[in-house]
């Protein structure tokens, strides 16, 4: 928990801000689910005044969750958005997500009104003319069997990638 000057800073920040977004660097690399530390810290951050938590570090896409803060607010948590652009070689590391969050402010306060996660994949294609690799982050919905066949990592079929994404993005 927060004590002393940390508590004063937090309270002052909350007074000055309409909405607090926290970007923790946390989690266990290559895990598809948040670990106990992430779950505990997410709740502590929510209770301390965070309105939205967007995590990173595990290099994998992890679930999205809604927490109830101590004051009753709903707090959206993206535990990890994975890699947007990467040269890691495992399928779980080639997947990521782009978060889209609509924040509204009205007479009742400021809150998340809508949110979604658009799954992405790193496609790595070899340029036949130069021999260089071309790295292309793209939406998973645009990933075709033709692109999968050209991908540097042949295990990344559309079916395998879609299954891995569904497994990684179960809601906590």
Please provide the spans of the model-predicted regions.
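Short acidic, glycine-rich surface-loop motifs adjacent to enzyme active sites
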Residues: 13-33
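Conserved small/polar residues in nucleotide/adenosyl-binding loops
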Residues: 2-11, 164-171
């Amino acid at each position: 928990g927060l004590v002393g000057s940390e508590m004063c800073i937090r309270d002052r920040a909350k007074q000055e801000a309409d909405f607090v977004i926290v970007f923790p660097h946390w989690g266990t690399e290559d895990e598809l689910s948040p670990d106990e530390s992430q779950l505990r810290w997410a709740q502590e951050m929510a209770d301390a005044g965070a309105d939205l938590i967007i995590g990173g570090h595990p290099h994998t896409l992890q679930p999205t969750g809604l927490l109830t803060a101590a004051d009753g607010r709903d707090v959206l948590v993206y535990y990890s958005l994975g890699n947007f652009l990467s040269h890691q070689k495992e399928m779980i590391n080639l997947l990521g997500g782009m978060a889209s969050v609509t924040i509204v402010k009205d007479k009742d306060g400021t809150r998340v009104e809508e949110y979604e996660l658009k799954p992405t994949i790193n496609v790595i294609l070899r340029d036949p003319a130069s021999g260089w690799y071309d790295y292309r982050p793209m939406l998973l919905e645009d990933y075709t069997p033709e692109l999968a066949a050209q991908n540097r990592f042949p295990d990344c079929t559309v079916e395998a990638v879609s299954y891995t994404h569904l497994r990684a993005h179960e809601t906590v």
